[in-house]
């Protein structure tokens, strides 16, 4: 797993209190990991802070899974 993926996974595990094994590429933050809309906003803010990037609102709405987050951050960082 890439450094970006490792860092994203750590943020997801810490913010959502889920087991690391549940955070897979296609794991939906809401459907699979139990996040609500506030959790997803907090995740986006944590990604922005961790990676020093800005995620516009329209892009944030497309980040629904762990894989989406890793892909977006990899392209933006």
Curated annotation (Swiss-Prot):
Q: Which Pfam families match?
A: PP-binding (PF00550)
Entry's SUPFAM superfamilies?
Answer: ACP-like (SSF47336)
Q: What cellular component GO annotations does this protein have?
A: cytosol; membrane
Q: How is it modified after translation?
A: 4'-phosphopantetheine is transferred from CoA to a specific serine of apo-ACP by AcpS. This modification is essential for activity because fatty acids are bound in thioester linkage to the sulfhydryl of the prosthetic group.
Arranged from A to Z, the UniProt key words for this protein are: Cytoplasm, Fatty acid biosynthesis, Fatty acid metabolism, Lipid biosynthesis, Lipid metabolism, Phosphopantetheine, Phosphoprotein
Q: Which GO terms describe its biological process?
A: lipid A biosynthetic process
Any idea which residues bear O-(pantetheine 4'-phosphoryl)serine here? 37
Q: Which InterPro entries match?
A: ACP, ACP-like_sf, PP-bd_ACP, Ppantetheine_attach_site
Spell out the molecular function terms from Gene Ontology: acyl binding; acyl carrier activity
Cell location? Cytoplasm
State whether keyword Magnesium applies: no
Domain of life where this protein originates: Bacteria
Q: What is its main location?
A: cytoplasm
Q: Domain Carrier, which positions?
A: 2-77
State which pathway it belongs to.
Lipid metabolism; fatty acid biosynthesis
Family affiliation:
Belongs to the acyl carrier protein (ACP) family.
What does it do?
A: Carrier of the growing fatty acid chain in fatty acid biosynthesis.
- Name of the protein: Acyl carrier protein
Q: Organism, per UniProt?
A: Cereibacter sphaeroides (strain ATCC 17023 / DSM 158 / JCM 6121 / CCUG 31486 / LMG 2827 / NBRC 12203 / NCIMB 8253 / ATH 2.4.1.)
> Which gene does this sequence derive from?
acpP
């Amino acid at each position: 797993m890439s450094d970006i993926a490792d860092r994203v996974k750590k943020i997801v595990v810490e913010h959502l209190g889920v087991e690391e094994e549940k955070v897979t590429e296609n794991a939906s933050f809401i459907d699979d990991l139990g996040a609500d809309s506030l959790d997803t906003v907090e995740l986006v803010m944590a990604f922005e802070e961790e990676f020093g990037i800005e995620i516009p609102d329209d892009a944030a709405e497309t980040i629904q899974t762990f894989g989406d987050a890793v892909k977006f951050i990899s392209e933006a960082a």
